[in-house]
Amino acid sequence: MTTPVAYLERPMKFINFVKYGDLDRIAAARKAHFAYADGLRARGELAIGGPLVDEQGRRIGLLFIYEAVSREAALGLVQEDPFTLANALRSYELIEWRLRGVNLDLLVKANRSGDQSDGSSSPVRLFAGYTKYRVDQSRLAAVRPAHWKYDQALEGAGKMALAGPFADDEGGLFVYNAARREEALSYLKQDPFAVEGVFASYEFLEWIIEGVNPALLTRDFSSSS
């Protein structure tokens, strides 16, 4: 029996974790980048995105979540970005991702326009934990139920905005809502994956949302599965 085309082309989510290289080129290409990102959202190819900020308040990269039918299609979106075309990036990691937990209200409240000019800012601060796991799959499986329960508790308390594993199960993205970086980092450090040594490494950065398409942020599986 032939598999339906609609099934074959079911969209997938891809994280693009970007680090800036040449800041002068970033500045020169920023307007074109904003326009490109707006177009992707309008076409249903960009779920959410915005700059990553370090502890000193410097914008050092980007975190985008694309929706595409294949990795090749998602890679095309990366390569056509004006920042990429301007050779302004130091690095990027494009990884297929599964969305397990989401708080759309938080994400919408955190959203701010990329060209906002009225000086206002969102009262919601988000912090992204971009994690890599150790290879021990048996340990990962043993700790996962406690990790899920912990994430559900954070989501219920309004402290978790996004959560889910990489498709290859070698890492995950966890986005926390907190007034301060220290508070958000404490949520990551209290995760059973952190306590039990599942996390091999992580990067932890504030994430400023500059555009969101809530219709694309549907769960790939339930928080309890």
Where are these regions (language model features)?
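Conserved, structured core segments of small domains
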Residues: T2-S225
